[in-house]
Amino acid sequence: MSSSFKFNYNMGDSRILVVINQRCLALPSMMSADGTCCNGDENRVIDTFSKLGFQDFVYRNMTTADLKDIVTLLTRHNHRTYSCVVVVILTDGAAVGEIKTADGSYKLRDFMTLFDVDKLRDKPKMFVVQTNRGAKIRRNHCKHASCQCLMYSSSERGGLRRIYSVIGWLCKVFGRSSSSPQFASQQLACLNYTLPVRETIVIYSYVDAFVLYGDTDVGSPVIYELCTALDKFGKSCNILTAITMMQHKVAKYVPAALPVVHMNCTRLMHYGDAPNDVTPSKATITTMIDGCSVILEEEGELSDDDGELRTASK
Protein backbone atom coordinates (compact mmCIF):
# COMPACT_ATOMS: atom_id res chain seq x y z
CA MET A 1 0.00 0.00 0.00
CA SER A 2 1.43 3.37 -1.02
CA SER A 3 2.38 5.78 1.76
CA SER A 4 0.41 8.48 -0.06
CA PHE A 5 -2.79 6.46 0.21
CA LYS A 6 -5.17 8.02 2.71
CA PHE A 7 -6.13 5.25 5.10
CA ASN A 8 -9.15 7.10 6.44
CA TYR A 9 -11.02 10.37 6.25
CA ASN A 10 -10.12 13.16 8.64
CA MET A 11 -12.64 12.20 11.30
CA GLY A 12 -13.41 14.75 13.98
CA ASP A 13 -15.66 14.50 17.01
CA SER A 14 -18.81 15.61 15.17
CA ARG A 15 -20.15 12.32 13.85
CA ILE A 16 -23.91 11.99 13.57
CA LEU A 17 -26.26 9.04 13.31
CA VAL A 18 -29.74 9.72 11.92
CA VAL A 19 -32.30 6.95 12.51
CA ILE A 20 -35.55 7.15 10.54
CA ASN A 21 -37.90 4.53 12.01
CA GLN A 22 -41.09 4.28 9.94
CA ARG A 23 -42.00 0.69 10.80
CA CYS A 24 -45.18 1.43 12.75
CA LEU A 25 -46.75 2.87 9.62
CA ALA A 26 -47.17 -0.64 8.20
CA LEU A 27 -49.26 -1.72 11.19
CA PRO A 28 -50.47 1.42 12.99
CA SER A 29 -52.79 -0.55 15.29
CA MET A 30 -49.71 -2.13 16.87
CA MET A 31 -48.03 1.17 17.77
CA SER A 32 -46.92 1.43 21.39
CA ALA A 33 -47.05 4.56 23.55
CA ASP A 34 -43.60 5.75 22.48
CA GLY A 35 -44.50 5.54 18.79
CA THR A 36 -42.71 2.29 18.02
CA CYS A 37 -43.64 -1.32 17.47
CA CYS A 38 -40.20 -2.75 16.78
CA ASN A 39 -37.24 -1.35 18.70
CA GLY A 40 -34.64 -4.06 18.12
CA ASP A 41 -32.84 -2.48 15.17
CA GLU A 42 -33.19 1.07 16.46
CA ASN A 43 -31.71 0.27 19.86
CA ARG A 44 -28.90 -1.78 18.38
CA VAL A 45 -27.66 0.84 15.90
CA ILE A 46 -27.77 3.57 18.56
CA ASP A 47 -25.76 1.42 20.97
CA THR A 48 -23.16 0.45 18.35
CA PHE A 49 -22.59 3.88 16.84
CA SER A 50 -22.56 5.67 20.20
CA LYS A 51 -19.52 3.53 21.06
CA LEU A 52 -17.89 4.85 17.89
CA GLY A 53 -18.43 8.47 18.93
CA PHE A 54 -21.64 9.25 17.04
CA GLN A 55 -24.36 11.59 18.26
CA ASP A 56 -27.77 10.11 17.47
CA PHE A 57 -30.93 11.77 16.16
CA VAL A 58 -34.02 9.54 16.09
CA TYR A 59 -37.22 10.33 14.18
CA ARG A 60 -40.30 8.12 13.94
CA ASN A 61 -43.41 7.95 11.78
CA MET A 62 -42.67 11.09 9.77
CA THR A 63 -44.77 12.58 7.01
CA THR A 64 -43.06 13.38 3.74
CA ALA A 65 -42.92 17.10 4.55
CA ASP A 66 -41.57 16.49 8.06
CA LEU A 67 -38.88 14.17 6.72
CA LYS A 68 -37.73 16.78 4.23
CA ASP A 69 -37.73 19.54 6.84
CA ILE A 70 -35.77 17.54 9.41
CA VAL A 71 -33.02 16.40 7.04
CA THR A 72 -32.80 19.82 5.40
CA LEU A 73 -32.46 21.45 8.81
CA LEU A 74 -29.67 19.06 9.81
CA THR A 75 -27.69 19.51 6.61
CA ARG A 76 -28.12 23.24 6.10
CA HIS A 77 -27.48 24.48 9.62
CA ASN A 78 -25.03 22.02 11.15
CA HIS A 79 -23.27 20.22 8.32
CA ARG A 80 -20.08 22.33 8.49
CA THR A 81 -19.22 20.70 11.81
CA TYR A 82 -19.91 17.13 10.70
CA SER A 83 -17.03 14.85 9.82
CA CYS A 84 -19.20 11.80 9.09
CA VAL A 85 -22.90 11.02 8.63
CA VAL A 86 -24.63 7.64 8.98
CA VAL A 87 -28.33 7.35 8.14
CA VAL A 88 -30.33 4.24 9.05
CA ILE A 89 -33.81 3.90 7.52
CA LEU A 90 -36.21 1.29 8.90
CA THR A 91 -39.38 1.05 6.85
CA ASP A 92 -41.93 -1.70 6.20
CA GLY A 93 -44.62 -1.93 3.56
CA ALA A 94 -42.78 0.31 1.08
CA ALA A 95 -42.06 -0.43 -2.58
CA VAL A 96 -38.52 -0.89 -3.85
CA GLY A 97 -36.65 2.40 -3.73
CA GLU A 98 -39.20 4.14 -1.51
CA ILE A 99 -39.56 5.14 2.14
CA LYS A 100 -43.02 4.74 3.63
CA THR A 101 -44.31 7.95 5.24
CA ALA A 102 -47.37 8.82 7.31
CA ASP A 103 -49.01 10.37 4.26
CA GLY A 104 -47.75 8.15 1.46
CA SER A 105 -44.20 7.41 0.35
CA TYR A 106 -40.95 9.21 -0.42
CA LYS A 107 -38.41 8.26 -3.09
CA LEU A 108 -35.06 7.15 -1.68
CA ARG A 109 -33.29 9.11 -4.41
CA ASP A 110 -35.02 12.33 -3.37
CA PHE A 111 -34.14 11.67 0.27
CA MET A 112 -30.45 11.13 -0.49
CA THR A 113 -30.32 14.23 -2.66
CA LEU A 114 -31.00 16.31 0.47
CA PHE A 115 -27.48 15.43 1.62
CA ASP A 116 -25.91 16.75 -1.59
CA VAL A 117 -24.80 20.11 -0.17
CA ASP A 118 -21.42 21.76 -0.75
CA LYS A 119 -19.82 21.30 2.67
CA LEU A 120 -21.10 17.74 3.06
CA ARG A 121 -20.55 16.45 -0.46
CA ASP A 122 -16.96 15.26 0.07
CA LYS A 123 -17.47 13.94 3.60
CA PRO A 124 -18.07 10.23 4.26
CA LYS A 125 -21.72 9.16 4.33
CA MET A 126 -23.32 5.76 4.82
CA PHE A 127 -26.98 4.93 4.25
CA VAL A 128 -28.38 1.67 5.65
CA VAL A 129 -31.88 0.91 4.37
CA GLN A 130 -33.80 -2.04 5.82
CA THR A 131 -37.20 -2.40 4.22
CA ASN A 132 -39.66 -5.29 4.19
CA ARG A 133 -42.84 -5.69 2.22
CA GLY A 134 -44.31 -8.07 4.85
CA ALA A 135 -46.97 -7.54 7.51
CA LYS A 136 -49.27 -10.13 5.92
CA ILE A 137 -49.69 -12.37 8.97
CA ARG A 138 -52.26 -11.43 11.61
CA ARG A 139 -50.65 -10.89 14.99
CA ASN A 140 -53.59 -10.43 17.32
CA HIS A 141 -51.79 -12.55 19.89
CA CYS A 142 -48.96 -10.05 20.30
CA LYS A 143 -48.67 -6.28 20.67
CA HIS A 144 -45.42 -6.19 18.68
CA ALA A 145 -45.85 -5.91 14.92
CA SER A 146 -42.73 -7.88 14.03
CA CYS A 147 -42.34 -10.40 16.80
CA GLN A 148 -41.31 -13.96 16.04
CA CYS A 149 -43.34 -15.55 18.84
CA LEU A 150 -45.61 -17.27 16.33
CA MET A 151 -42.68 -19.64 15.83
CA TYR A 152 -40.93 -19.80 19.17
CA SER A 153 -41.52 -18.78 22.75
CA SER A 154 -39.51 -15.91 24.22
CA SER A 155 -37.21 -18.39 25.99
CA GLU A 156 -36.09 -19.78 22.64
CA ARG A 157 -35.36 -16.49 20.89
CA GLY A 158 -31.66 -16.82 21.60
CA GLY A 159 -31.36 -19.34 18.79
CA LEU A 160 -30.76 -16.75 16.07
CA ARG A 161 -29.68 -19.17 13.39
CA ARG A 162 -32.74 -21.36 13.85
CA ILE A 163 -35.11 -18.40 13.76
CA TYR A 164 -33.40 -16.86 10.73
CA SER A 165 -33.47 -20.15 8.85
CA VAL A 166 -37.22 -20.50 9.44
CA ILE A 167 -37.88 -16.92 8.34
CA GLY A 168 -35.77 -17.46 5.23
CA TRP A 169 -37.83 -20.54 4.40
CA LEU A 170 -41.06 -18.60 4.86
CA CYS A 171 -39.77 -15.96 2.45
CA LYS A 172 -39.29 -18.59 -0.23
CA VAL A 173 -42.70 -20.17 0.38
CA PHE A 174 -44.87 -17.06 0.78
CA GLY A 175 -42.93 -14.43 -1.13
CA ARG A 176 -40.23 -13.89 -3.70
CA SER A 177 -36.68 -14.41 -2.54
CA SER A 178 -34.46 -11.36 -2.86
CA SER A 179 -31.64 -13.73 -3.81
CA SER A 180 -33.22 -14.49 -7.21
CA PRO A 181 -31.37 -12.94 -10.20
CA GLN A 182 -34.43 -10.99 -11.35
CA PHE A 183 -35.10 -9.40 -7.97
CA ALA A 184 -31.41 -8.78 -7.24
CA SER A 185 -31.06 -6.93 -10.54
CA GLN A 186 -34.12 -4.86 -9.64
CA GLN A 187 -32.49 -3.87 -6.35
CA LEU A 188 -29.21 -3.02 -8.04
CA ALA A 189 -30.92 -0.93 -10.71
CA CYS A 190 -32.72 0.94 -7.94
CA LEU A 191 -29.46 1.68 -6.17
CA ASN A 192 -27.67 2.82 -9.30
CA TYR A 193 -30.51 5.25 -9.83
CA THR A 194 -30.62 6.50 -6.26
CA LEU A 195 -26.97 7.33 -5.60
CA PRO A 196 -26.60 11.01 -6.53
CA VAL A 197 -24.16 11.88 -3.74
CA ARG A 198 -20.36 11.49 -3.69
CA GLU A 199 -18.34 9.67 -0.99
CA THR A 200 -21.29 7.46 -0.15
CA ILE A 201 -21.89 3.84 0.81
CA VAL A 202 -25.42 2.43 0.56
CA ILE A 203 -26.49 -0.86 2.14
CA TYR A 204 -29.95 -1.70 0.81
CA SER A 205 -31.92 -4.76 1.93
CA TYR A 206 -35.44 -5.30 0.60
CA VAL A 207 -37.23 -8.48 1.62
CA ASP A 208 -40.38 -9.16 -0.38
CA ALA A 209 -41.88 -11.48 2.21
CA PHE A 210 -45.07 -12.07 4.13
CA VAL A 211 -43.22 -12.08 7.44
CA LEU A 212 -41.71 -8.96 8.94
CA TYR A 213 -38.11 -9.17 10.02
CA GLY A 214 -37.24 -7.17 13.11
CA ASP A 215 -37.79 -9.05 16.34
CA THR A 216 -38.13 -6.61 19.24
CA ASP A 217 -35.09 -8.14 20.93
CA VAL A 218 -32.95 -9.41 18.07
CA GLY A 219 -33.65 -7.11 15.12
CA SER A 220 -33.25 -7.76 11.39
CA PRO A 221 -30.40 -9.98 10.20
CA VAL A 222 -28.62 -7.24 8.23
CA ILE A 223 -28.68 -4.68 11.05
CA TYR A 224 -27.76 -7.32 13.62
CA GLU A 225 -24.74 -8.61 11.69
CA LEU A 226 -23.55 -5.13 10.67
CA CYS A 227 -23.59 -3.92 14.27
CA THR A 228 -21.89 -7.10 15.47
CA ALA A 229 -19.09 -6.58 12.94
CA LEU A 230 -18.71 -2.91 13.91
CA ASP A 231 -18.65 -3.80 17.61
CA LYS A 232 -15.71 -6.12 16.92
CA PHE A 233 -13.82 -4.29 14.17
CA GLY A 234 -15.27 -0.76 14.03
CA LYS A 235 -12.22 0.88 15.61
CA SER A 236 -9.54 -1.32 14.09
CA CYS A 237 -10.42 -1.61 10.40
CA ASN A 238 -12.18 0.25 7.62
CA ILE A 239 -15.93 0.04 7.18
CA LEU A 240 -15.69 -2.11 4.04
CA THR A 241 -14.15 -4.93 6.08
CA ALA A 242 -17.05 -4.80 8.53
CA ILE A 243 -19.54 -4.80 5.64
CA THR A 244 -17.84 -7.84 4.12
CA MET A 245 -18.12 -9.72 7.43
CA MET A 246 -21.81 -8.78 7.57
CA GLN A 247 -22.37 -10.05 4.02
CA HIS A 248 -20.61 -13.30 4.87
CA LYS A 249 -22.90 -14.03 7.82
CA VAL A 250 -26.15 -12.95 6.12
CA ALA A 251 -25.36 -14.93 2.96
CA LYS A 252 -24.76 -18.04 5.05
CA TYR A 253 -27.77 -17.91 7.36
CA VAL A 254 -30.39 -15.67 5.70
CA PRO A 255 -29.62 -15.39 1.96
CA ALA A 256 -33.09 -13.95 1.27
CA ALA A 257 -32.11 -10.84 3.26
CA LEU A 258 -28.70 -10.35 1.60
CA PRO A 259 -28.44 -6.61 0.85
CA VAL A 260 -27.09 -4.87 -2.20
CA VAL A 261 -24.05 -2.73 -1.33
CA HIS A 262 -23.23 0.21 -3.57
CA MET A 263 -20.46 2.78 -3.11
CA ASN A 264 -18.68 5.65 -4.83
CA CYS A 265 -15.97 6.37 -2.25
CA THR A 266 -12.48 7.53 -3.21
CA ARG A 267 -10.95 6.80 0.21
CA LEU A 268 -11.34 4.16 2.87
CA MET A 269 -14.01 5.02 5.40
CA HIS A 270 -12.63 4.47 8.91
CA TYR A 271 -14.50 5.08 12.17
CA GLY A 272 -11.55 4.41 14.46
CA ASP A 273 -8.91 6.73 15.85
CA ALA A 274 -6.20 6.05 13.26
CA PRO A 275 -4.64 9.32 12.00
CA ASN A 276 -5.04 10.44 8.42
CA ASP A 277 -2.35 9.61 5.82
CA VAL A 278 -1.19 6.56 7.73
CA THR A 279 -0.33 3.24 6.11
CA PRO A 280 -1.31 0.37 8.43
CA SER A 281 1.69 -1.48 9.82
CA LYS A 282 2.32 -5.19 9.33
CA ALA A 283 1.35 -5.76 12.96
CA THR A 284 -1.98 -3.96 12.44
CA ILE A 285 -2.77 -5.99 9.33
CA THR A 286 -1.85 -9.24 11.12
CA THR A 287 -4.15 -8.33 14.02
CA MET A 288 -7.05 -7.69 11.63
CA ILE A 289 -6.41 -11.01 9.82
CA ASP A 290 -6.33 -12.85 13.14
CA GLY A 291 -9.59 -11.25 14.21
CA CYS A 292 -11.34 -12.28 11.00
CA SER A 293 -9.85 -15.77 11.22
CA VAL A 294 -11.27 -16.26 14.70
CA ILE A 295 -14.78 -15.77 13.31
CA LEU A 296 -14.12 -18.18 10.45
CA GLU A 297 -12.70 -20.77 12.85
CA GLU A 298 -15.82 -20.47 15.00
CA GLU A 299 -17.91 -21.20 11.92
CA GLY A 300 -15.64 -24.11 10.92
CA GLU A 301 -14.76 -22.43 7.62
CA LEU A 302 -10.98 -22.03 8.07
CA SER A 303 -9.05 -24.98 6.67
CA ASP A 304 -5.71 -26.25 7.97
CA ASP A 305 -3.99 -24.81 4.90
CA ASP A 306 -5.43 -21.39 5.65
CA GLY A 307 -4.15 -21.58 9.21
CA GLU A 308 -0.65 -22.52 8.06
CA LEU A 309 -0.66 -19.66 5.56
CA ARG A 310 -1.75 -17.19 8.24
CA THR A 311 1.03 -18.40 10.57
CA ALA A 312 3.61 -18.05 7.80
CA SER A 313 2.54 -14.46 7.14
CA LYS A 314 3.60 -13.52 10.64
Curated annotation (Swiss-Prot):
InterPro entries per UniProt: Caspase-like_dom_sf, Pept_C14, Pept_C14_caspase, Pept_C14_p20, Pept_C14A
Entries under Gene3D superfamilies matching the protein: 3.40.50.1460
GO biological process: positive regulation of neuron apoptotic process; proteolysis
One MF annotation (Gene Ontology) recorded for this entry: cysteine-type endopeptidase activity
Tree of life domain: Viruses
Sequence similarity: Belongs to the peptidase C14A family.
Function (record text): May be involved in viral replication.
UniProt name for this protein: Caspase-like protein
Annotated source species: Heliothis virescens ascovirus 3e (HvAV-3e)
Biological classification of the source: Viruses, Varidnaviria, Bamfordvirae, Nucleocytoviricota, Megaviricetes
